[in-house]
Amino acid sequence: MNLSESNNIKIIKTDDINACLEIRRKVFIDEQNVPTELEIDDYDTSNSECEHFLITDNGTNVGTFRLIYDKPEIAHMQRLCVFPEMRGKGYGYSAMSFLKEECKRRGNSKITLGAQCHAIPFYESCGFVCVSDVFLDAGIEHRTMECVL
C-alpha cells in the first residue's frame, strides 16, 4: 500500500495525542496486557524530543507510532501499532516507508527500535537488523534493531 490522499500519516502535537493513545491502549494495554503506567510515559505528555504520528485511511484512525530524537543523527522509533481489525492491510509497511523517508529528510543516519520478538520478521522485511540479545520490556521479549539510512 502506498500512502495517498486517503491514506496518510500526520504529526500529532503532544496536546492532541488522544487518538494515538486510544490505539495504543487497545493494542498494548488491552490486547497485550501492558500496565498503563508502563505504556503511558513522559514522552506522551510534554517531551519536545518526541513526535507522535497518526496513521489514517479515509479519515479513519488505524495506527500510530512515535519518534524520539534524543541522540544526534539517530531517530528511535517506538510504539508502532495498528488496530487489530486493520492489520494485514499494509499500514505498517506504509508507516515504515514513511518513517525512513522522513528520517532521511531530517538528516538522520540511523533508526533504532525495540522490536517485540514476534514482529522481528516484519522489521527485517523493512530493512532492519537485530543488534542485541533478547531483553524483557513490560514482560514481553524484545530485541534492539536498527536500520542504517
Where are these regions (language model features)?
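Conserved acetyl-CoA pyrophosphate-binding loop and the N-cap/start of the following alpha-helix
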Residues: 86, 90-98
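Conserved catalytic-core motifs of GNAT/GCN5-like acyltransferases
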Residues: 112-114, 124, 129-144
